[in-house]
Amino acid sequence: MQKKSEITDINGTKKDIACLSCAIVNRNVTPPGALPVSDFFDAHQDYEVPIPGFIILASKRHIQSVDEFTKEEQQDFIQFLSRLRKAMRESLGIEKVELIQDEDTRHHFHMWLFPRYDWMEEKFGRKIESIRPAMKYAQENMKTEENL
């Protein structure tokens, strides 16, 4: 049996879950900014960081890395990723995005589609190491109805 963890969503609601990605895929929790899903992947706004357009693209099954994708998942992934990125540009006007594959998980492959806004560069710089301070700033200062 998987150990449960307590998470706190961007509204301050606490939930006990074993696997956040499974809880999202099975709709046991509803993340803010729920987006379309594909046959093999789910996309949603980050559960704790209220930056508009910050998308987590996660596998529906338990894998950690792209080298575990089936052929069908490989094809679905690139098409879904392209569709999400296009929507970020067209709907939100996001011109720059950092794609970060994070294998620091026990359960689901996931990739961050992290939008780069002018305020981030002004406050924290442009380099990749500026992402964490921008996320922390958003958690502390951007929990507004508009960003949820």
Describe the role of every protein-language-model region.
Residues 1-148:
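HIT superfamily nucleotide-processing domains
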